[in-house]
Amino acid sequence: YNPLRRPELVTERRNVVFQQMYRNDMITKDERDSLSLLPLNIDYSPESHREGLATYFRAYLQEFMNKWLRDNPKPDGSRYNLYSDGLRIYTTIDSRLQSLAEESMNEHLKNLQSEFFSQNKESEENPTPPFKDLREGQVDTLIKLSAMRSERWRKMKLNGKNEDEIWATFQVDTPMKVFSWSGEIDTIMKPIDSIRYYKFHLRASMMSMEPQTGHVKVWVGGYNYKHFQYDQVKQGRRQIGSTFKPFLYATAIDQLKLSPCYTVPDALYCIEPMKHGNMNAWCPKNSSDRYGQTRNLKNALANSINTISARLMDQVGPKPVVTLMKKMGINSYLPEVPSIALGTPDISLYEMVGAYSTFVNKGIYIEPIFITRIEDKNGVPLFEVIPETTDVLSEEAAYVTVNLMEGVTKYGSGGRLRHSGLEETNYIYKNLITGYPYAFENAIAGKTGTTQNQSDGWFMGMVPNLVTGVWVGGEDRAVHFDDIAFGQGATMALPIWGQFMKKAYLNPELGISKEDFPVPEIVSIPLDCENLNIESSEKKKDLEELGF
């Protein structure tokens, strides 16, 4: 008795009820007759993707399904109706984890945005907020380009308005509702001013995946689909900063059998001109601009030491690193030049989570899966997903890379995940590290990432059965914090991961692992750096031959 598919049957059934009411003296004959003549007047529209849980995922799912419906007609050749044909679509999203992820993102972004507003007031030193290092003319151009991509502009263009007419409407005070973290605001504002207002707002995305199955458990493309419809999980591509480095280290481990314990001098290092596709010499500096220590590879990755990344890139070359990343599902453009070691390529969060899952899944890449099957109304399967896998790394090389990344959360840039609260007097810890202290004691591998000028903050966090990536940044690269203490991945993105995992561990039914990462049966590469004297071993000679 679906009123959308069988209105005549439903009308007949309704009139039977009216007849029974008349027979039982509940209504008069005239009332029965008049009610029976009324149409159903079904007030129905499909649920909006603008509100509720997993709005960005539902919008992406609808896009996927629309394409699937075009390519997969009914047996009679007609097209399935997504809303009225009773299709059963089974997705991999865990609503409980999804809810925790959205809560965690909202809690942290609210704190972070408040700080960003306070640091971006217009002044003589900051004449074009929220844009850093842009002149007024450049800002005007950027704003106009954004206006031309807006829904308002598109609709007026379709209605035959010319550019001057459309642009004039952007200068007129207009009633509108705008987003704020304290709730939607009814206001009057010029559309051109609303664009700049929204540019002030930092954006974010988050995705979680079960590495052994490829099942996507969390998909958060942003924090308010009504006002920010661009999905930063799959559509957005941003520079990934130091989250690139595990791919470089994994290539070196796989090709050269390097141990996390190998010691390397932290000194300025140059790749000479005309080598590895370079036209000029490439001599990256450390973000701290400090040098002089001797570090093992585990410490170097934990602290994102650029000079040691340059040494590794010189030894393996960019091409093998790019080849590895493409096998791990990264289809974004990757130039084969040494500077990619610092994370200059633009890559989506979707690609990054899939790629990082390879490390936890014994070196096997599984393409992320968000639908397992589609059935018709009778339960007949119409579509079932067969996971696509690729052998990328040996199980040993994958495990050693995970072991390296465990150092990031033990004594590196992700170490605040281990803190128990001793830093509470610090302004940033007290006000911006949402959910702090986390005091995690279980095995966690991860990597922070921060791009040039703090335009992007990343954190990739892994436990044995869940890989999660978080990105935070402005819509435009010119929108960023000035101070790296505020704009680094450990401040912008890591707290979302920490808060999310903290909440997830409170519910044992979710089954999120607190165990150690499984160790392969054979591990020939030394991992116990405290009890291994590399300097007195034959490995020192091997390293010298490799240029270390």
List the model feature ranges, each with a label:
Residues 17-28, 65, 69, 108-116, ...:
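A generic secondary-structure signal for well-formed alpha-helical elements
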Residues 1-8, 17-18, 22, 42-52, ...:
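Second-shell loop/turn segments in exported
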Residues 45-57, 258-319, 365, 375-406:
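Conserved catalytic neighborhood of penicillin-recognizing serine enzymes
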Residues 278-285, 316-354, 363:
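Mid-domain, small-residue-enriched loop/turn segments at the edges of structured enzyme/sensor domains
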Residues 231, 235-276, 411, 502:
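Active-site rim segments in enzyme catalytic domains, especially the processed small/beta chain
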